UniProtKB/Swiss-Prot annotation:
Origin species: Aspergillus clavatus (strain ATCC 1007 / CBS 513.65 / DSM 816 / NCTC 3887 / NRRL 1 / QM 1276 / 107)
Domain Peptidase A1 as annotated: residue spans: 85-391
The protein's name in its UniProt record: Aspergillopepsin-1
Entries under PANTHER family matching the protein: ASPERGILLOPEPSIN-1-RELATED, BETA-SITE APP-CLEAVING ENZYME, ISOFORM A-RELATED
Gene3D superfamilies per the UniProt record, alphabetical: Acid Proteases
Taxonomy of the source species: Eukaryota, Fungi, Dikarya, Ascomycota, Pezizomycotina
Annotated active site: 101, 283
Major localisation: secreted
Length: 394
């Protein structure tokens, strides 16, 4: 999530981040599989989702998007067959379904500090005998779409895929806005960005990955997200059965705490490469693919009937339109995002107008390679370097 405040604690003149301890012994690695959760018949406000993605990284929200979000002009209900994919995590003895988010560095959860009316349907974290409250510790997040959450911080035992982190910072929500209450299946978030991005005050805390990576065979994790199927997160090793060809690696700039990289160019529908570099963040916590205005405009010139709609707060097009693929060029590798993923779905129930999965990155200042991009890729997040690796999914 967005950096709300970066707090640095100096010890002997060096910036530090409070760390937890993994449980011995060293092991090669582990896999956590997402689980399908039946989708509730809930409405999705598409412009609000877009605004949330922009403000997550400190960007400004265009007025047309704000108006569309407030009017609910593009509100749709997922189809009955849709499913949601979350990952089970044992937090202090309670199994919770969390979003794994490479665009943030906080582990925050619904907790018993919230009113009972706000936790109905959720697994709730209640600090027990393994927990200790972090003295003076607090956290707070807020977004331009009005959503916010805040609370206290505990050190507790967290288990993911059989690997245990003792003394892991757990951010217990004591206040949460209505936007976060709509998804009854999701009990919180586990951040996988760099620990420098952690928002705990007065001292940032380490992420789960940074806590356990010394116990892994290799200090990396690999992400395989799927379209309409559960994905997986592999920690400590690379599963060669999950990709084809060679993995193309590129350097990461983590100066802002994100998995930021630069692609060499792009092409549309298999056409000629633009040759224009694209810098952006690999973010499993953002649904859309957010790109520079000129790239987005170029793409939708290839979609018949596409327009940047003030009414719907983004690019829309006839649902019957043929949507080309979008190819991101990384070294000698071509990462292809199929057109079927870019057609996000009808703007409202039963509408013949569809919302685009590629939208403008606006005032963010960099591009966001969200799930629309990631669901066709096998991606290695390697903390040594650091670097990112990309290959086509098997």
């Amino acid at each position: 999530m967005v950096v709300f405040s970066k707090v640095t604690a100096a010890v002997f003149g060096l910036a530090t981040i409070a760390s937890a301890a993994p449980a011995p012994p060293t092991r090669k690695g582990f896999t956590v599989q997402q689980q399908a959760r039946p989708a509730q018949k809930k409405q999705v406000n598409l412009p609000a989702m877009y605004a949330h993605a922009l403000t997550k990284f400190g960007g400004s929200v265009p007025e047309s998007v704000k108006v569309a979000a407030s009017k609910g002009s593009a509100v749709t209900t997922p189809e009955a067959g849709d499913v949601e994919y979350l990952t089970p995590v044992n937090v202090g003895g309670t199994v919770m379904n969390l979003d794994f988010d490479t665009g943030s560095a906080d582990l925050w959860v619904f907790s018993g500090e919230l009113p009972a009316s706000e936790t109905s349907g959720h697994s709730v974290y209640k600090p027990g005998r393994t927990a200790s409250k972090l003295p003076g510790g607090s956290w707070q997040i807020s977004y331009g779409d009005g959503s916010s959450a805040s609370g206290d911080v505990y050190k507790d035992t967290v288990v993911v895929g059989g690997v245990t982190a003792h003394g892991q910072a757990v951010e217990a929500a004591a206040q949460i806005s209505s936007q976060f209450l709509q998804d009854k299946n999701n009990d919180g978030l586990l951040g996988l960005a760099f620990s420098s991005l952690n928002t705990v005050q007065p001292q940032p805390q380490t992420t789960f990955f940074d806590t356990v990576k010394s116990s892994l065979d290799r200090p990396l994790f690999a992400v395989t997200l799927k379209h309409n199927a559960p994905g997986s997160f592999d920690f400590g090793y690379i599963d060669h059965s999950k990709y084809t060809g060679e993995i193309a690696y590129t350097d990461v700039d983590n100066s802002q705490g994100f998995w930021s990289f630069t692609a060499d160019g792009y092409s549309i529908g298999g056409g000629q490469s633009s040759g224009s570099s694209i810098s952006g963040i690999a973010d499993t916590g953002t649904t859309l693919l957010l790109l520079d205005d000129n790239v987005v405009s170029d793409f939708y010139q290839h979609v018949e009937g596409a327009q940047n709609s003030d009414e719907y707060g983004g690019y829309v097009f006839p649902c019957s339109a043929k949507v080309p693929s979008f190819t991101t060029i990384i070294g000698g590798y071509k990462a292809v995002t199929p057109g079927k993923l870019i057609n996000y779905g009808p703007v409202t129930d039963g509408s013949s107008t569809c919302y685009g999965g590629i939208q403008s990155s606006g005032g963010v200042g960099q591009n966001i390679f969200g799930d629309i991009f990631l669901k066709s890729q096998f991606v290695v997040f390697d903390s040594e370097g650091p670097r990112l690796g990309f290959a086509a999914q098997a």
